[in-house]
Amino acid sequence: MEKLLSVIIPVYKVEKYISKCIESVIDQTYKNLEIIIVDDGSPDNSGEICEKYARKDSRIQVIHQENQGLSGARNRGLDRATGDYITFVDSDDWIHPNMYEIMMKQFGDSQIEIVVCDYQEVLEGQEPAKVDICKCSKTIMTEKELDNGYLMFEKKTRFVVAWNKIYKRSFFDDIRYPVGKIHEDAFTTYKLLNKAKGVLYIDIPLYYYVIRETSIMGEGFSDKRLLILDALIEEMVFFEIKQKYKVLGLVFLDYRDYLIDYKKKIKSENEYSLDILKPYFSVLNKYLVKMKKMQIPLKKQIKSFIFAKFHIVIL
């Protein structure tokens, strides 16, 4: 019998998009689904639209709650979920009709505990490019390869976001998303990946990520962006405690590159003082002495040292 997959859909103020999202889930070729929709205090008709679908499909359950943000809505769904596996869909996105069938088949290997697929960005109002699901390639990462971390960082965004993955349910027994923070995936996904004996990556885009005109983050700098640095600091501490120094080194370089980018943006926009980055440069300096242990190449060590000490970027 097919394993039960719990699909968690947090919903807030998406009456224009939610029908397409829900229909893409209920039309999946993989049928053994528990669809948990969390209406996070939507002020529009989103909750009512969700209830309409629940009356038509017994696999759907709708939870209504006071607004707690994306993390709070996901956590409420996790508390309710009873499936063998967990996945998420953002309520303004949609998915390929074969997504769950293709991904759930990969769990036949006992070592595979998380399956990841590629995704495609779709501008609001447009349709995605067609994909040939027969021409996908797969990469299996064992625990040792995950500790090296290279593929995870080569395809960085794909391994940070929550919604292009299917996870073993037990991975969430002691993990929840941080309420009140944006970039919640950056605070959480690495902990889930660290639990896995094996991760399988499928290189075809089965998830359609909608780029809306009213996206949370613009291109400019905002102090909210510093939460990415906070998440990376937590991640560095996590991998240092685990003594996984290769992954730690990759997170360190990621942290450094974000700092470089934010410093440039602050200087060019003149809306914030560079003093806002002082605590983050202190963290960068703290890790300089560990670069050799993190197996960072010499050229990157030099670039990191010069930037940390003199705030100068060399190519």
Locate each region found by the language model.
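N-proximal low-complexity "stem/linker" segments adjacent to membrane-targeting elements
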Residues: 1-26
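Acidic helix N-cap motif at the loop->helix transition within catalytic regions
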Residues: 19, 33, 44-52, 64, ...
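A conserved acidic beta->alpha catalytic loop
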Residues: 24, 31, 39-48, 66, ...
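A short, glycine-/small-residue-rich helix N-cap motif at loop->alpha-helix starts
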Residues: 66-73, 78-81, 181-182
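Donor-binding/catalytic cores of nucleotide-activated saccharide
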Residues: 70, 91-199, 214-223
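Short aromatic/hydrophobic "clamp" motif used to bind/position activated sugar donors
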Residues: 86
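Catalytic core of nucleotide-sugar-dependent glycosyltransferases
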Residues: 206-212, 219-245, 258-287
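Membrane-interface aromatic/basic loop that binds lipid-linked glycans or pyrophosphate carriers
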Residues: 266-315
